[in-house]
């Protein structure tokens, strides 16, 4: 929705509300809630914030994200500071009022024409009642400036073969019980809605048939804005909010999506990680920004990405399986934490180095590449990270000094090295060739770094640190010379947080370009 409103010349910002008690998303396991998306200011948020930034080209801040925990925390802090002037502070109205205040601050700061607020969870859940109450209060105060979009799902049971509208009817009525009437219903389904279903939903949910927007499964998520415009959604929203269109221009977006659909040749990438499985299901959401960044870069290199998830623990159980990596054009190891699966990742890295398979390591993937090189080339037997082995003889990866203080206090939430930091690139390196400038700014999320005590020895052994902090203390990028390997690069930061469909990240572009050459 934000994308199509931008195409009409409006400035847009977005806010995500998550109804859990966690103050932010930083302490949750990726298999529990998906990827933790880090904003430029270092705030750890829900993966949806990444979608907002990728679709709308925004740089959001902590003002654009709230949880039940963060709202209650602010209200309690204000009460302790006597900001309520001795009043009895109650769940209602003070929690909804704090929510409204947060929304207005974010909207004012962005100076946007439209602020889109997503309330997470499902209608009928107890957790989001207070956020719905805040929304009701906003509508009551200024009815012409607030509208509601209800996203529902219309199942098509296999044994029946008919699209069912009852769940949507029930959701709309449950929303009504919170004092809210939907202005639009976005109906998700496997197939497009027919007119009969639209009319049935309109009658039972008290809206016009044209306000029921069909949202079928599409080939690419980037088709969604184009699909919405088939139902003229932006026109309807502008009319409802009494806003004037300044232009109509989705042309560049439509052109890119059309190009993607015409792609024939593929590029095969293996993603070796450990946050894939949840019970009997595979959860790719744990690495959603990496996945989207690979797609962006593949499209720009005129390739369809063929991604395969590999659980690194399987290489620990059966090292012979490493041979399967030979069938891929490139291997990527994303960020992670802890000891599980580490040795499997190191085995995969060693295989890529020896077999000259393009390798891209992100955060932990960079640290483990340094460990692999230290063990087998620099001759530091047993080299490790103190995150895994606190008593290792060769701690080539060690905790940042300021992080020791935080961990001693058990201050785990929001205390890592987070957000944007600058780095300087070394001339003549793969990294320097990939970027348009030698000074870069990237987003970080880590407690551990390359141990400065081992940098000289690793360099002498042939490892190139092609990116460092401006003071030269922190190693931000490690790579092998192109004379030894076509593409072997590890980065301490998270480039996936700054890639978009229309502007892929330089390092992902370079990685995919190298991968496309492997088959030749």
How does the language model describe each region?
Residues 3, 324-422, 428-430, 501, ...:
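Cysteine-nucleophile active-site neighborhood
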Residues 13-16, 116, 149-150, 186, ...:
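Structured core elements
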Residues 418-422, 426-520:
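C-terminal and late-domain segments of enzyme folds
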Residues 246-249, 360-361, 379-387, 432, ...:
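Acidic/polar loop patches that form or flank catalytic/metal-binding clefts of enzymes
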């Amino acid at each position: 929705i934000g994308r199509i409103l931008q195409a009409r010349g409006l400035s847009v910002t977005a806010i995500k509300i998550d109804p859990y008690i966690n103050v932010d998303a930083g302490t949750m396991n990726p298999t529990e809630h998906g990827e933790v998306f880090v904003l430029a200011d270092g705030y750890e948020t829900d993966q949806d914030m990444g979608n907002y930034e990728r679709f709308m080209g925004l740089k959001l801040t902590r003002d654009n994200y709230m949880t039940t925990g963060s709202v209650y925390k602010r209200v309690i802090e204000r009460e302790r500071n006597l900001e309520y002037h001795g009043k009895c502070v109650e769940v209602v109205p003070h929690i909804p009022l704090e929510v409204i205040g947060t929304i207005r601050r974010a909207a004012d700061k962005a100076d946007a024409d439209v602020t889109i607020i997503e309330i997470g969870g499902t209608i009928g859940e107890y957790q989001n009642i207070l956020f719905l109450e805040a929304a009701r209060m906003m509508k009551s105060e200024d009815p012409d400036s607030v509208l509601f979009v209800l996203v529902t799902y219309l199942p098509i049971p296999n044994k029946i073969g008919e699209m069912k509208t009852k769940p949507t009817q029930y959701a709309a009525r449950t929303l009504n019980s919170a004092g809210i009437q939907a202005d639009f219903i976005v109906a998700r389904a496997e197939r497009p809605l027919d007119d009969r279903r639209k009319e049935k939903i309109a009658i039972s949910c008290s809206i016009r048939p044209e306000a029921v927007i069909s949202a079928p499964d599409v080939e690419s998520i980037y088709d969604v804005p184009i699909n919405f415009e088939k139902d003229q959604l932006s026109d309807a929203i502008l009319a409802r909010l009494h806003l004037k269109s300044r232009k109509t221009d989705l042309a560049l977006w439509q052109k890119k999506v059309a190009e993607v659909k015409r792609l024939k040749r593929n590029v095969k990438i293996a993603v070796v990680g450990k946050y894939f499985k949840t019970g009997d299901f595979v959860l790719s959401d744990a690495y959603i920004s990496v996945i989207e960044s690979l797609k962006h870069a593949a499209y720009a290199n005129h390739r369809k990405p063929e991604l395969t998830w590999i659980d690194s623990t399987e290489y620990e159980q059966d090292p012979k399986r490493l041979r399967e990596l030979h069938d891929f054009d490139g291997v990527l190891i994303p960020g992670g934490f802890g000891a599980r699966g580490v040795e499997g990742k190191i085995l995969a890295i060693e295989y890529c180095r020896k077999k000259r398979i393009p390798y891209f390591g992100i955060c932990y993937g960079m640290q483990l590449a340094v460990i692999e090189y230290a063990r087998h080339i620099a001759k530091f037997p047993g080299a490790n990270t103190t995150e895994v082995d606190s008593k290792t003889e060769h701690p080539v990866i060690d905790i940042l000094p300021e992080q020791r203080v935080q961990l001693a206090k058990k201050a785990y939430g929001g205390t890592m090295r987070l957000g944007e930091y600058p780095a300087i690139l070394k001339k003549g390196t793969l990294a320097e060739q990939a970027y348009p400038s030698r000074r870069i700014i990237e987003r970080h999320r880590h407690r551990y770094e390359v141990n400065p005590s081992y940098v000289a020895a690793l360099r002498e052994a042939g490892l190139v640190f092609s990116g460092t902090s401006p003071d030269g203390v922190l190693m931000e990028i490690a790579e092998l010379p192109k004379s030894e390997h076509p593409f072997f690069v590890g980065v301490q930061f998270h480039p996936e947080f700054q890639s978009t469909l229309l502007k892929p990240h330089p390092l992902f572009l370079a990685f995919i370009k190298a991968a496309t050459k492997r088959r030749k």
